[in-house]
């Protein structure tokens, strides 16, 4: 069969041989072009997937090998848990609206009376003057500087509100006893070491509220 084909090729006119050779080269070129085209399309698709993954933020566990995905998932869960954690002491200090609501009736009445005097009577004027002088005399901090530069009426209102917050922090629960009073101070002590202005205000609130505490 091969010898017959070879004999036919030898006997074939030269112009036909040229035509067949050109056709063969054309087929090879077309085949090579298709291969290059397929390779180019595959490369574009890979680049597109990579770009989409980058725009999404990061590679998801589903696109990673199984062992790497198992390592990433606990880290993600740990990060989510840490985001939900909040410092309990600071929350307790800053949450004003719920403090003092569960005090005993007698203590609650005394607490509200004291707060009313701070906002409406001479006790409040004496309080803000004392706080202003103590803050002025202390070592300068960004918070103390901010308060000292306030307009007088605004500063007085801010100091009264901060004092009220501390009063409601210290006097709360079914019945606040002296040991509870001391314990609440210890709870917020780390916070006060960083916030010297708050420490001064808390000390004045402590002094004002001491008569409410039952032995």
Swiss-Prot record:
Transmembrane segments: none annotated. Pfam families: Paramyxo_C. Residues 15-22 are annotated as: Involved in self-degradation and in host STAT1 degradation. Changing residue 168 to A: 63% loss of binding to L protein in protein C'. Y1 and Y2 proteins are produced not only by alternative initiation, but also by proteolytic cleavage of C'. Only alternative initiation is detected in vitro, whereas in vivo cleavage seems to be predominant. It comes from the Viruses. The keyword Oxidoreductase does not apply. The keyword Hydrolase does not apply. InterPro entries: Paramyxo_C. Residues 12-34 are annotated as: Disordered. Keywords: Host cytoplasm, Host-virus interaction, Inhibition of host innate immune response by virus, Inhibition of host interferon signaling pathway by virus, Inhibition of host STAT1 by virus, Inhibition of host STAT2 by virus, Interferon antiviral system evasion, Viral immunoevasion, Virion. GO terms for cellular component: host cell cytoplasm; virion component. Belongs to the respirovirus protein C family. The P/V/C gene has two overlapping open reading frames. One encodes the P/V/W proteins and the other the C/Y proteins. The different isoforms prevent the establishment of cellular antiviral state by blocking the interferon-alpha/beta (IFN-alpha/beta) and IFN-gamma signaling pathways. They inhibit IFN-alpha/beta induced tyrosine phosphorylation of STAT1 and STAT2. Blocking the IFN-alpha/beta pathway requires binding to STAT1 in the cytoplasm. They inhibit IFN-gamma induced serine phosphorylation of STAT1. Block the IFN-gamma pathway by binding to and stabilizing the parallel form of the STAT1 dimer, further inducing high-molecular-weight complex (HMWC) formation and inhibition of transcription by IFN-gamma. The disordered region at the N-terminus is involved in C protein self-degradation in trans. This self-degradation of C protein may play a role in the regulation of viral RNA synthesis. The disordered region at the N-terminus is also involved in the host STAT1 degradation in order to counteract the host innate antiviral response. The different isoforms interact (via C-terminus) with unphosphorylated and phosphorylated human STAT1 (via N-terminus), favoring the formation of parallel STAT1 homodimers. The different isoforms do not interact with host STAT2. C protein interacts with L protein; this interaction has an inhibitory effect on viral transcription and replication. This is C' protein. The gene is P/V/C.
């Amino acid at each position: 069969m091969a010898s017959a084909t070879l004999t036919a090729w030898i006997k074939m006119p030269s112009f036909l041989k040229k035509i067949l050779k050109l056709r063969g080269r054309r087929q090879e070129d077309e085949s090579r072009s298709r291969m290059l085209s397929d390779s180019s399309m595959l490369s574009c698709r890979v680049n597109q997937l990579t770009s989409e993954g980058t725009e999404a933020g990061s590679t998801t566990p589903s696109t990673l090998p199984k062992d790497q995905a198992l390592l990433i998932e606990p880290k993600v869960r740990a990060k989510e848990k840490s985001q939900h954690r909040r410092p309990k002491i600071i929350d307790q200090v800053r949450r004003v609206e719920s403090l003092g609501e569960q005090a005993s009736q007698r203590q609650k009445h005394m607490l509200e009376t004291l707060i009313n005097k701070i906002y409406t009577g001479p006790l409040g004027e004496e309080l803000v003057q004392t706080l202003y002088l103590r803050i002025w005399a202390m070592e300068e901090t960004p918070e103390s500087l901010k308060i000292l530069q306030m307009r007088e009426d605004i500063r007085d209102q801010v100091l009264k509100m901060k004092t009220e917050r501390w009063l409601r922090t210290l006097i709360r629960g079914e019945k606040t006893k002296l040991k509870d009073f001391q314990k609440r101070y210890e709870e917020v002590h780390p916070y006060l070491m960083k916030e010297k202005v708050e420490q001064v205000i808390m000390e004045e609130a402590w002094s004002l509220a001491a008569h409410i505490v039952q032995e």
